[in-house]
Amino acid sequence: MMTHKALRSSLVATAVAGLCTLNSGCLLMLSQLGNGGDDDFIEGDDVRLALPSGVSMRAGDPSEIRGDVYVIIDNTIKDTNTWVTGSVEGMAAIYRFLDRRRETSTDGDWRVYGPYADDDGRDLAWLVKLDDVEGVQKFELHVGPRDAKSVADVDKLLDGELSVDQNLRSGGFNLYFDTIEAHPEMKNEDDSLHTFSGMIHVTFERDVDTQRKQIDIKFDDFQVLYQGFLDDDTFFSDETYNYRTEDDGSGSFHLALYGQWDDWGWSGPETEKMVLDMAWTPDGEGRSRGQILEVDGVGDLKHGDLDINECFVSDGYITWRTINDAYIDEVPDYNIGEESVCVLGIEALPG
């Protein structure tokens, strides 16, 4: 499917940016020192996404394949785990470490730690603000120039809160990408090809006694501009990324993102909307759909809107797959099976 490379490149860029903010300089040192401790604190599993049974490695009939949409969603989930889980685990570890130490100063009710000069020698300094109100741990992460002396000299990179109420863990955080651009030394060589703007708001809730979990990622004027050696690509979104699992193990996934999907020559430089949806049963059987849509007459898809539908068994192998008629001449052998084998109808999809 032509969208795979383009979608992954945009999400990987986001992941790298999110990770470098929490795993750089002195903050990496602090997170390593802070590992372990309070079992009631937020943990990686609280925000980790997964398909029903993951992608199994069992040997099978060579004719068995996983669908394009299934593979894209699986890779998107893995990319998202990298920076969402990394952000939460990193911030939780930093909170544990600093919460047991005397603050550098105070700012109202906030305890302020730093600014600390970056351990890697870059022109960066890091500052953390913590507060605890009735069991809700609030945090802010700031970054500024290496000679920063106070809160006034740094910019907010991330803020959020974490809480635990018996078996229910919840929280959220905001990641401000404009701050990354204001301090480009946070970027590594690969990131230097990307320009970020806007913010992402992540919220999550998990019942540790069941399989119920929900994770929402709201894009707010979020944009990634990739400036490559051969061409440029832009990806942006004001939509929401949703992941749900219920008590019985059933679940759903939804993501919408605008971008340029021209890797296979089925689209030109215009921007279209990609929509990915999936739903699955407690047994892990399910249905997925991938669409690339022209919006308000904008787009240059070769044959208009693209629509791929799939059904799969619990290990992700497809039982049915179809592409809309407008594109079947491009891939005449694409359609497989009959829709009657699907355990879920299209109405089960969240989009």
Please state what every model-predicted region is.
Residues M2-V12:
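Bacterial N-terminal signal peptides that target proteins for export
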Residues V12-V16, C20:
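Hydrophobic helical h-region of N-terminal Sec-dependent signal peptides
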Residues L22-G25:
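C-terminal motif of bacterial Sec signal peptides marking the signal peptidase cleavage site
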Residues L27-G135, I308-G351:
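N-terminal "mature head" segments of proteins
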Residues A93-T195:
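Short N-terminal edge-element motif at the start of the domain
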Residues S105, A117-D119, V133, P145-K149, ...:
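Acidic surface patches and DE-rich sequence motifs
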Residues D155-D277:
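Short helix-loop boundary/capping segments
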Residues D248-S250, H254-G351:
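Extended, charged low-complexity segments
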